[in-house]
């Protein structure tokens, strides 16, 4: 690996100081394009604000700016929303622009807008000319079917529409093609049943009920029963227990059982034997039911999980379920079952750092100290949470293995001369990240392997840190900690650390994991900014800490985000008795969830972390612990002690407020 990446192993951070070069070429480009960039941003903003077309006033400098086509595309999109008498010209402009930039990222957004406009206006001939199957969305594909139907070009179309029909979700853009399929007698009961099953298999009950209505009356019963089992699993299963002769689709029965096991494992446990007996299921046939219940019990830290795992046939285990059997055994301190579960995993899974660590823990508990030591030592060079845990078990300190990717100025300059990379940089500087990523991907695809490695440094020099880290991951460059663990927000982090009385390394660890340094990051849950705070959480924290009430835009301010994020973390640390892994889990999953996960009595921290039910949260805690170690090592240049990682997770008495919160919160469950 070292030869391929031309990495330099360094015993100290000082040895690589001279290697941390910033792209001189990028700085020169930044200066040379400054005026044109400002003109572009101003003009682009005026288009977004729906100002009239001002292209006649564009300067030659603006026209020669690499992003000028993006301004042209924006103006054409604006024209496509213009008055009816101007649309013919807009259509021609759009068609000409797309033809001139057929393969370029700049045409993608315009093509989508053009197709949408043509579909709304039923300009089907132009639609077919502009449509490309490659990269088309489901909606655009449906619109293309409509175009062919309206133009009478239906040869071979039925098979394509039938394939599109087989989706488990609503596709309103395909209403016309599906109606055409039905009118031509091609929407058969078999096709309808297949779509109903697809919807039911993913739990999309409301949509399944809509499609069920299209079935012949004598065919709806089994599917309505399936839907009812998903909506009301406990009542439906009780009916099937009370009426052993009542027919039920085997997939519907298992789906209803799985839904009950996940939402109410206690109720499922009470009914397991009765259901198996009533339906006449042999031990072999009952195995999937035992597995569904065992998994849910394991996610809920119920020791009965192991009893049901014992009822599962070996053929029904996969790596994911074996992992949860191992976790349940680890939590129950049944190290023999834990070891057996690890041995049963696939070779690839068994050799991961996670399961080598737990194999070592099991060996130690089963008094095979030599095997435990061998496995622990095999982990030490892995540089991750498990290697640090192994070091703690061996009473050793941790020094991350620094492998530096040295800069090659010739390659760096060659990368920045690639037109797509130049556009990517300018788009990034203009805050157009989605477009910047598309141009980066185009440019990256044209690079040599050596250039791709150096492109990590290019992105980092641009301060596009999340992209640098993403490319480094793709190139398997994990250990250039100087490059991949920057500290661009030291002023803000230090201020937040003083306020919340936290170590800066802890704040940086959370910041890196939450946003990868993206000031403008927005999650699917509408968490925003460097520390990924939702507005209500930020305002509640500000009120508690007597800080100004933030608006939504304030969450993108680095100082506000780091300060309120650190304050939130401090509040969670205080709530959970200073236990960092618990507070981190609460920062990610919410305090109410973590209250449910707290042990009734003290448990080893590695055991508790491994049994966090949400895979995202488990990985989140583990990665941040490693990030904190790395940031602290970079700052202090000292070997890091991890013996504190072994401190048990202590039970914390629940308050009345905790109990009220638990009563009002649905338990999101699922393996991970």
Stretches found by the model and what they are:
Residues 11-22:
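Bacterial N-terminal signal peptides
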Residues 49, 82, 121, 151-152, ...:
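Structural motif corresponding to the intra-repeat A-B loop/turn of tetratricopeptide repeats
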Residues 76-77, 98-99, 111-116, 289-302, ...:
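Alpha-helical adaptor scaffolds
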Residues 64, 73, 270, 274-277, ...:
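Catalytic glycan-binding domains that act on GlcNAc-containing polysaccharides
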Residues 26-74, 80-83, 400-421, 429:
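N-terminal leader/linker segments that initiate helical-solenoid repeat arrays
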Residues 30-39, 51, 64-72, 87-90, ...:
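Generic helix N-cap/helix-start motif at coil->alpha-helix transitions
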Residues 54-59, 86-99, 124-133, 155-166, ...:
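Alpha-helical repeat scaffolds
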